[in-house]
Amino acid sequence: MRKIGYYEYNPVIYPRKLCVAIGMNQDDANNCFKGRNGERLIVDFRDSDALTFDSVIQKKDGKYTVFVNFANKSVMTMGICSHEASHICDAIEEDIGMKHGGEPSAYLIGWISSCINKARLGIGDFVEIKDRGK
């Protein structure tokens, strides 16, 4: 049976974690994360292969994070992953007041892309959702 959860990555120099899930449903996403104003996350893959939530808080520790959820592993193509990495980069830069462009942005996008690929390969700190539906 497949474990349900997400991979968590810490960029160290930026005050935002990156959480990457593959196929997480709406209930599980809302058990782990909430919007910064307490709103529920809407997970709907009918028109999307992936969803990036840029203004969320992890419920386990109250820390701000960027959360990306891919519908399944097969949609994690270079194009889709790059597209989501761009959104994630924009979100982190906006949060910390960093101007987009140049080497700092290129390195950040590279780190994000690497994290997404690691999640696709099953590498990283996996946070398993336990006690589902209780």
Regions found by a protein language model. Give the residues of each.
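Long, compositionally biased intrinsically disordered regions
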Residues: 66, 133-134
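Non-catalytic terminal regions of proteins
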Residues: 1-49
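Active-site recognition of the HExxH zinc-binding catalytic motif
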Residues: 79-91
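Post-HExxH zinc-binding segment in Zn-dependent metallohydrolases
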Residues: 99-132
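Active-site scaffold of zinc-dependent metalloenzymes
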Residues: 34-75, 88
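Ordered hydrophobic segments in well-structured contexts
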Residues: 6, 17-23, 54-58, 63-71, ...
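A cross-kingdom feature marking charged/low-complexity
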Residues: 76-77, 129
